[in-house]
Amino acid sequence: MYPVDLHMHTVASTHAYSTLSDYIAQAKQKGIKLFAITDHGPDMEDAPHHWHFINMRIWPRVVDGVGILRGIEANIKNVDGEIDCSGKMFDSLDLIIAGFHEPVFAPHDKATNTKSMIATIASGNVHIISHPGNPRYPIDFKAVAEAAAKHQVALEINNSSFLHSRKGSEDNCRAVAAAVRDAGGWVALGSDSHTAFTMGEFEECLKILDAVDFPPERILNVSPRRLLNFLESRGMAPIAEFADL
């Protein structure tokens, strides 16, 4: 098991079922050292208000030896790469994931989806693109992976895509992983947990990476320090409380 999980939702996204405390308890049981809460951006129908994200600054950094990153899974809104995260939200957040979600940005043709995703990557506002292998949103894998490598943005391999949602993602995710491998970029693994019980579960992700001989040194979840180095290289100030994770 990798000790970092970068994608999960709490009851603040009302189609999810666990609290921050639930995730902390599960992290302790499973040996997760660092995790990110990434509730849906406010343009989703059942997402929390933008004040929810701004107020994350009151969270403790470490609880019982488990580090907590303040994050969001923002929505890509348009072909210009705009996301539903802005202003003071950026000041409170450590990790910004962004992806396509049908209630906010309907599926388009391959060229339009690719243009939108690359614009988001190039904006400098995101660290990870969520579930880029979604078959509802065809993209040019090579072009997206090369843009992501250029701008130091990771592409996610999402464990939930193989179990509960986005059915038919396997071939696309293998193509994503191979394209990132060839471009020299990063992948991030996300459980996309909507209940704490699936936190840290990456078994299906690892099958995808093994199938394309993906280099483990380009996986962000290998250690807290690797993930923090990545975020710091993107401009996040070092967080003293995480020094001993």
Curated annotation (Swiss-Prot):
Entry annotated with the keyword Metal-binding: yes
- What's the protein here called? Probable phosphatase YcdX
Q: What GO molecular functions are on record for this protein?
A: phosphatase activity; zinc ion binding
Gene behind the chain: ycdX
- Has UniProt tagged this entry with the keyword Ligase? no
Q: Which UniProt keywords apply?
A: Hydrolase, Metal-binding, Zinc
Domain of life of the native organism: Bacteria
Please cite one Gene Ontology biological process associated with this protein: bacterial-type flagellum-dependent swarming motility
User: What SMART domains does the record point to?
Assistant: POLIIIAc
E.C. number(s) listed in UniProt = 3.1.3.-
Q: How does it assemble?
A: Homotrimer.
Binding positions for Zn(2+) 3?
A: 73, 101, 131
